[in-house]
From Swiss-Prot:
It is found in: Virion; Host nucleus. GO terms for biological process: 7-methylguanosine mRNA capping; cap snatching; DNA-templated transcription; symbiont-mediated suppression of host gene expression; symbiont-mediated suppression of host mRNA transcription via inhibition of RNA polymerase II activity; viral RNA genome replication. Transmembrane segments: none annotated. The keyword Zinc does not apply. GO terms for molecular function: RNA binding; RNA-directed RNA polymerase activity. This is Polymerase basic protein 2. Pfam families: Flu_PB2_1st, Flu_PB2_2nd, Flu_PB2_3rd, Flu_PB2_4th, Flu_PB2_5th, Flu_PB2_6th, Flu_PB2_7th. A motif (Nuclear localization signal) lies at residues 736-739. Gene3D superfamilies: Polymerase Basic Protein 2, C-terminal domain. It comes from Influenza A virus (strain A/Gull/Astrakhan/227/1984 H13N6). The record marks 627 as: Avian adaptation.
Length: 759
């Protein structure tokens, strides 16, 4: 108060007032403070001060032609005086208003294209539904999540090249667009952004949002796909949650989801084949997800899931160093151990050989519905702090931790024999045997574990053997916490190796993953998964096997035709015929195979009986090990649609129907492709078959006498030449071969040579 009074007194004296209001500021320190550097020191003040002036804006001289000097109200929009120190014009804020109302308009067509991610977000929110708000304790755990819906999965470098190519196509600098997705995106964007007037830098920023996955390590309770993360601030607080259903899906979430399903299916299928690793690679390379090659997606997509990581390891890609056990991701946070083989006895006196981890270690365990911190010593659980969504999830985590601890009381709790097998009917390793056993029934395990009184610790509570919470007692060493355990945040990737049984190890030889860890959960993929590998045909049931087998034969008919005549045994052993065998009734397989093979042999031996359609139709039946019998069949049975359906040996049936007019084959009513019979198979086909064993030398040569009919040919001696009458009354010169070995190629060359000789 005192100082204000003093100031008032001072201001009342006109000389002081003059000094305070008119004198220039010439104190060096003050001048320095406000003038050094480009950074504005007091932007708010500067803005107020500028806007209080009549002409706070400067503009290019051209503005004088584009804007009138005065607006409709007669207010001046720009001053004729030049801006000091530049040749720009001083402009009033009113000019901006005039420009916005009356200035030129530009096309808005590119805005939705450039700001695509925002426009799509608005649509999702518009169509999303927000449900009620619930107040309850939120168990949030930090997970690495995708915060940018609707992106492609390019690496930063790949995206940079695409952006440079699209936005600054004429800039110098080496840009190599290699991947399929890079090329597709570049082409698409160049077309979309033709004649785009939006500032290139803006376009570049927005393209980056569209092309690159951005992840953050955020506390989440609930959905982790990017369409949930974009509304995280609306759906979960510290003590509340709001139900939300997104108003649309985005491709990146669909890719992640479909990739997991494809990888699980492939790993499960590979496990049961003779060489799992080779099969897995073959399937990964021949599978497409939403029209993009699975191997390209695996290289770019950071999804961490057991099956996906096994596929990545097989391709030689780096994966996370954490390991998986019982569906939980374990990350060692401190301590170390050495491994030693040890024999232990179960409660049923069965001997198990387990690899014991000797030493003190601490782990974080993260699962879909529960998380935990585990401290253990050699074959002893010291402490487990677990949190989860519900009783069931907490129990799952406790079982996994108890088995992982390798404690004796756990092994002694086994009742009955352990003989669990995997899909390929091989016994599981001892640790997974124990896990499966207790996952089925953990009552004895929990009863035998032992309980202890507990101290009252904030946020912690005990849990009894029947999985009910308790404040005084708890299972030995085990506590339930309100707080979740964060997922391992590091994105570090390590080099791993994989053996032919798909066990993935780090460089120290620790097993990180194995097919036993792959979830059995079935889901429906959001994007179309196309498995081109014959190993995956059975995934969609018997009909798919049938259609795929015939489609494969038709696609490869040229190669098959040659093998059919030259090396049938090799053809019958092709793995593409394996799935088909499961459709043929077990009792009939060998008989059918013997019958068809004999029939084919007759076709090879007896002239004029080569029949493309029949060979294609019966070929899959010849793949089973044959039984030599004299049995004849007029139809062969396949088990589809829940019952036996017949394939007629001669003629069409609902299973196999060839339309001669359209030259198309339908299998169970589905189109299986177009089939070109050997040209004019009725005649030329017969001739090419007949002329096997004969070399066509060219046009008719009168020196070799009158033309013989095809039937008279059989009387020629080896090496003898003759004219022969074929098809439409044309005559060609042939010679009977001296050796039988080359007979096989004749059918193919005969047709071509007949044409050449005639023309």
């Amino acid at each position: 108060m005192e100082r204000i009074k003093e100031l008032r007194d001072l201001m009342s004296q006109s000389r002081t007032r003059g000094i305070l209001t008119k004198t220039t500021v010439d104190h060096m320190a003050i001048i320095k403070k406000y003038t050094s550097g480009r950074q504005e020191k007091n932007p708010a003040l500067r803005m107020k001060w500028m806007m209080a002036m009549k002409y706070p804006i400067t503009a290019d001289k051209r503005i004088m032609e584009m804007i009138p000097e005065r607006n409709e109200q007669g207010q001046t929009l720009w001053s004729k005086t030049n801006d000091a120190g530049s040749d720009r014009v001083m402009v009033s804020p009113l000019a901006v208003t005039w420009w916005n109302r009356n200035g030129p308009t530009t096309s808005t067509v590119h805005y939705p294209k450039v700001h695509k991610t925002y426009f799509e977000k608005v649509e999702r929110l518009k169509h999303g539904t927000f449900g009620p708000v619930h107040f309850r304790n939120q168990v949030k755990i930090r997970r690495r999540v995708d915060i940018n819906p609707g992106h492609a999965d390019l690496s930063a470098k790949e995206a940079q090249d695409v952006i440079m190519e699209v936005v600054f196509p004429n800039e110098v600098g080496a840009r190599i667009l290699t991947s399929e997705s890079q090329l597709t995106i570049t082409k698409e964007k160049k077309e979309e952004l033709q004649d785009c007037k939006i500032a290139p830098l803006m376009v570049a920023y927005m393209l980056e949002r569209e092309l690159v996955r951005k992840t953050r390590f955020l506390p989440v309770a609930g959905g982790t796909s990017s369409v949930y993360i974009e509304v995280l601030h609306l759906t979960q607080g510290t003590c509340w949650e709001q139900m939300y259903t997104p108003g649309g899906e985005v491709r990146n979430d669909d890719v992640d989801q479909s990739l997991i399903i494809a990888a699980r299916n492939i790993v499960r299928r590979a496990t049961v084949s003779a060489d799992p690793l080779a099969s897995l690679l073959e399937m990964c390379h021949s599978t497409q997800i939403g029209g993009i090659r699975m191997v390209d997606i695996l290289r770019q997509n950071p999804t961490e899931e057991q099956a996906v990581d096994i596929c990545k390891a097989a391709m030689g890609l780096r994966i996370s160093s954490s390991f998986s056990f019982g569906g939980f991701t374990f990350k060692r946070t401190s301590g170390s151990s050495i491994k030693r083989e040890e024999e232990v006895l179960t409660g049923n006196l069965q001997t198990l050989k387990i690899r014991v981890h000797e030493g003190y270690e601490e782990f974080t365990m993260v699962g879909r519905r529960a998380t935990a911190i585990l401290r253990k010593a050699t074959r002893r659980l010291i402490q487990l702090i677990v949190s989860g969504r519900d009783e069931q999830s907490i129990a799952e985590a406790i079982i996994v931790a108890m088995v992982f601890s390798q404690e004796d009381c756990m092994i002694k709790a086994v009742r009955g024999d352990l003989n669990f097998v995997n899909r390929a009917n091989q016994r599981l390793n001892p640790m997974h045997q124990l896990l499966r056993h207790f996952q089925k029934d953990a009552k004895v395990l929990f009863q035998n574990w032992g309980i202890e009184p507990i101290d009252n610790v904030m946020g912690m509570i005990g849990i009894l053997p029947d999985m009910t919470p308790n404040a005084e007692m708890s299972l030995r060493g085990i506590r339930v916490s309100k707080m979740g355990v964060d997922e391992y945040s590091s994105t570090e990737r390590v080099v791993v190796s994989i053996d032919r049984f798909l066990r993935v190890r780090d460089q120290r030889g620790n097993v990180l993953l194995s097919p036993e860890e792959v979830s059995e959960t079935q889901g429906t993929e959001k994007l179309t998964i196309t498995y081109s590998s014959s190993m995956m045909w059975e995934i969609n049931g018997p009909e798919s096997v049938l259609v795929n087998t015939y489609q494969w034969i038709i696609r490869n008919w040229e190669m098959i035709k040659i093998q059919w005549s030259q090396d049938p045994t090799m053809l019958y052993n092709k793995m593409e015929f394996e799935p088909f065998q499961s459709l043929v009734p077990k009792a009939a397989r060998a008989q059918y195979s013997g019958f068809v093979r004999t029939l084919f042999q007759q076709m090879r031996d007896v002239l004029g009986t080569f029949d493309t359609v029949q060979i294609i139709k019966l070929l899959p039946f010849a793949a089973a090990p044959p039984e030599q019998s004299r049995m004849q069949f007029s139809s062969l049975t396949v088990n589809v649609r829940g019952s036996g359906m017949r394939v007629l040996v001669r003629g069409n049936s609902p299973v196999f129907n060839y339309n001669k007019a359209t030259k198309r084959l339908t299998v169970l009513g589905k189109d299986a492709g177009s089939l070109t019979e050997d040209p004019d198979e009725g005649t030329a086909g017969v001739e090419s078959a007949v002329l096997r064993g004969f070399l066509i030398l060219g046009k008719e040569d009168k020196r070799y006498g009158p033309a013989l009919s095809i039937n008279e040919l059989s009387n020629l001696a080896k090496g003898e030449k003759a004219n022969v009458l074929i098809g439409q009354g044309d005559v060609v010169l042939v010679m009977k071969r001296k050796r039988d070995s080359s007979i096989l190629t004749d059918s193919q060359t005969a047709t071509k040579r007949i044409r050449m000789a005639i023309n």
